[in-house]
């Protein structure tokens, strides 16, 4: 069973329907025990880092996800789900940084509105951008059959930091991770 994690925000039904459409046994859940014992986890996007972090801490979901990942449960993070893999995030965090899962080092922060030359960019970043694979990304199952330079759709104002887990990047004001991978079971 694939657990689509409900943290009281997110595009839950569309993710559940998509997984079911391709033959997955997907179920939306907020239950830490179901999360801990699921065959695979999906943490969907939409919402603010601070709200998601607070809800996931209060409900025990953070610890359940960490426990599942520690035993090797496959994980897919989408948008905010990618950011939550990091140590923390500043989105709507009135008192600095809210904690993330801490699987990857670094803090998700607001995307700069200007590049290094002072050129202005619209934030949020909404639209199609090409991605560039890191050298070893060609072996990632996340990009099986997808050529380097392919276009993906983005809608966001916050970005994950570059890290050893970065397997693809794109550029909008700055170059940032479009995808990350930890080992052979954690993808976003």
Model-found features: residue ranges?
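Short glycine-/small-residue-rich Rossmann-like dinucleotide-binding loops
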Residues: 9, 45-48
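Short gly/ser/thr-rich secondary-structure transition/capping motifs
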Residues: 21-28, 56-59, 130-137, 169-171
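Amide-donor transfer/coupling interface in amidating biosynthetic enzymes
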Residues: 70, 106-188
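Short acidic/histidine-rich motifs immediately flanking catalytic phosphotransfer sites
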Residues: 35-45
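N-terminal beta1-alpha1 ligand-phosphate binding loop
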Residues: 2-24
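Cysteine-nucleophile active-site neighborhood
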Residues: 47-126
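Structural signature of beta-strand start/N-cap positions in the alpha/beta core
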Residues: 25, 40, 74-76, 151
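Short acidic low-complexity segments
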Residues: 26-37
């Amino acid at each position: 069973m694939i657990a689509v994690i409900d943290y009281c925000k997110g595009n839950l039904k569309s993710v559940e329907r998509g997984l079911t459409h391709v033959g997955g046994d997907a179920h939306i859940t907020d239950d830490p025990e179901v999360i801990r014992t699921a065959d695979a986890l999906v943490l969907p996007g939409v919402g603010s880092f601070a709200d998601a972090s607070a809800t996931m801490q209060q409900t025990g979901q953070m610890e359940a996800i960490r426990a599942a990942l520690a035993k090797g449960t496959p994980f897919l993070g989408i948008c905010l789900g990618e950011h939550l893999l990091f140590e923390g995030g500043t989105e709507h965090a009135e008192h600095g940084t809210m904690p993330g899962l801490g699987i990857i080092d670094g803090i998700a922060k607001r995307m700069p509105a200007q590049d290094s030359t002072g050129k202005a960019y619209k934030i949020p970043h909404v639209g199609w951008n090409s991605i560039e694979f890191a050298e070893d990304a060609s072996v990632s199952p996340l990009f099986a059959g997808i050529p380097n330079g392919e276009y993906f759709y983005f809608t966001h104002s916050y970005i994950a930091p570059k890290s050893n887990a970065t397997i693809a990047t794109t550029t909008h004001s700055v170059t940032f991770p479009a995808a990350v991978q930890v080992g052979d079971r954690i993808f976003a």
